[in-house]
Amino acid sequence: MLPAQPDDQASQCTQEAWTLAFGRNPNVGDARGRAIKAIETLLKPIVSPKNNKATIGSMTNELRQAPDKWECKLADRVYNVNGEINSKRGIEVLIDALATIGYQPDRHGSDQPQDVDEATARSVLFLATTVVGWLRDGTPRTIDSIEK
């Protein structure tokens, strides 16, 4: 499956995000917001189908709190830190991507709005497009849905 499909809210949000990021009149803050909305649209039915107010942050926390509830098609990541071999399960890799995308320093901790850095916002859009593809491809799913 592709990240964009016709007549789909997530596709519309993704297309709007790309236009806002790279169009003639860029607005990278809004581009990042639309990219996040695309993910929320696809992630909500999987993670929080009964929560009408689910956000990327709340759904990331839900995944983080119960990682054993999920099967994820992403490969486990094995890495070396100071000679010590560590591993991260595929679901944790997805959680890290969602946390990276969802973190918006311009929205937290200050009464003064901060400008959105163009390179950062575009990087979020690139990663968000990948996550949209993962979600469309069924990368995360509940263990219960596998057993049925």
Where are these regions (language model features)?
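Residue-level detector of well-ordered alpha-helical segments, enriched
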Residues: 9, 13, 30-34, 90-97
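Inward-facing hydrophobic residues that define packing positions of alpha-helical scaffold repeats
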Residues: 14, 35, 42, 73-77
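Short acidic alpha-helical/loop segments enriched in Asp/Glu that coordinate divalent cations
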Residues: 13, 26-34, 45-63, 142-147
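Charged alpha-helical initiation segments
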Residues: 1-29
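Long, charged low-complexity segments
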Residues: 57-148
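A broad detector of the eukaryotic-type serine/threonine protein kinase catalytic domain
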Residues: 19-22, 43, 107-110
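Non-catalytic, well-ordered alpha-helical scaffold segments
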Residues: 15, 33-36, 122, 129
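Alpha-helix capping/termination and helix-coil
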Residues: 21, 39-50, 67, 139
